[in-house]
């Protein structure tokens, strides 16, 4: 079995500074991060890409014209939009809606799991922003769709 290795050279965004450096990836895993000390930096450093950890979006309803409530296509479109903006994982968030819509949202999330790859952000789970909200604190949520957590229809 051969090992896939890749050296990524660029400007590393570190805890305390940005430094020229290299990340070594083997079989899809980062095995080393080596920052240069600044001595002898090459003149083309400004043209090197920034290399930073991916962002995690813990509350998103979609992006790039896609809505996660719009089934598998909305979930996939959102995942592709987010990765293009540095978000590597996310929690799609459903809105307060009729129960069948929330079930469809959960099913779209489940269907999106196999689509994970380098060109899509990974959904880590999902949030239901509603329907279990207090009517006193509903904000912009449609009160028609608010539900009691003890609702037997969810079984």
Predicted regions and their residues:
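N-terminal metal-binding scaffold of metallo-dependent hydrolase/deaminase domains
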Residues: 1-39
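Glycine- and other small-residue-rich loops at beta-strand/loop junctions that grip anionic moieties
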Residues: 67, 94, 143-146
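Fold-independent oxyanion-binding glycine-rich loops
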Residues: 9-11, 15-16, 47, 54-58, ...
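N-terminal hydrophobic targeting/anchoring segments and the immediately downstream early-domain regions
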Residues: 71, 82-85, 108, 112
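Metal-coordinating catalytic core of metallo-dependent amide/deamination hydrolases
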Residues: 107-155
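Divalent metal-dependent hydrolysis catalytic cores, especially in the metallo-beta-lactamase
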Residues: 61, 76-105, 120-135
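Divalent metal-coordination and catalytic microenvironments
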Residues: 10, 23, 28, 48, ...
């Amino acid at each position: 079995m051969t090992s896939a290795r890749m050296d990524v050279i660029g400007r590393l965004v570190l805890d305390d500074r940005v430094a020229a450096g290299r990340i070594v990836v083997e079989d899809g895993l980062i095995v080393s991060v080596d920052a240069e000390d600044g001595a002898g930096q090459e003149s083309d450093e400004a043209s090197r890409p920034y290399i930073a950890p991916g962002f995690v979006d813990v509350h998103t309803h979609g992006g790039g014209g896609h809505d996660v409530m719009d089934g598998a296509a909305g979930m996939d479109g959102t995942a592709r939009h987010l990765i293009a903006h540095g978000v590597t994982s996310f929690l799609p968030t459903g809105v307060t809606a009729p129960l069948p819509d929330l079930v469809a949202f959960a099913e779209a999330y489940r269907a999106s799991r196999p689509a994970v790859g380098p060109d899509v952000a990974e959904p880590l789970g999902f949030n239901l922003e509603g329907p279990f909200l207090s009517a006193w604190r509903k904000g912009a949520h449609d009160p028609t769709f608010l539900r009691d957590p003890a609702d037997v229809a969810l079984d």
